[in-house]
Amino acid sequence: MKKLFPLLLTLLLISSCEDSIEVTTTTNINESASVTILETNGTAINFNEVIEGDLNQLVSNFNSINDITIDSLSYTFANVTGNENAVITSATIEINATTVAVISNINIAQEALNGSVFEITDTAVLDQLETIFLNNSSVTVQLSGMAISDEGDVNFDLEFSMQLTAAF
């Protein structure tokens, strides 16, 4: 019995020493793309904008990451100048070739004026992006679609915000 207590204490200490300490860091990524849609004459025109980035520049020791969680992902329209009646008739937002949003019939100026924030909450999409980011540090955001701006040119920014937590 005298030897059992020290043995149990030793086993407890050894097993607790083996537990690894997980270190996490949270970072915010904010990027924007400036989009110009020229005046249309009753017919929607194509547009395509791309933002590229690298998580290595934002998260030190990126290669040591063993888990990534996207805490939030959203986009907004901002800094609209020109035609206030321009409409995105249809568009797709992709991150690393994964569709995160499909847009249709949005008045760009109205959404900017309202301060609308479009949250991406689909867990399947977020899980897919987390897996992609674990294997590839490059981030490519693409906005492509069709728009009508019959009353003149319109310029606006499409702003993306992503908060992610990385575990080492």
Language model regions located:
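C-terminal motif of bacterial Sec signal peptides marking the signal peptidase cleavage site
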Residues: L13-S16
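Cysteine-clustered segments with highest specificity for TGF-beta superfamily mature ligands
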Residues: S116-S161
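An anionic, turn-rich surface loop/hairpin at beta-sheet edges
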Residues: T99-D127
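N-terminal leader/pro-regions and domain N-caps
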Residues: E18-T40, T165-F168
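Extended, low-complexity, turn-rich repeat/linker tracts enriched in Gly/Pro/Ser/Thr and Asp/Glu
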Residues: T76-V87, I148-G152
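Short, surface-exposed beta-strand/strand-loop-strand elements in extracellular ectodomains
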Residues: E84-T99
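Post-signal-peptide N-terminal segment of Sec-exported extracytoplasmic proteins
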Residues: I37-S72, A78, N83
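Sec-dependent signal peptide recognition
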Residues: K2-L7
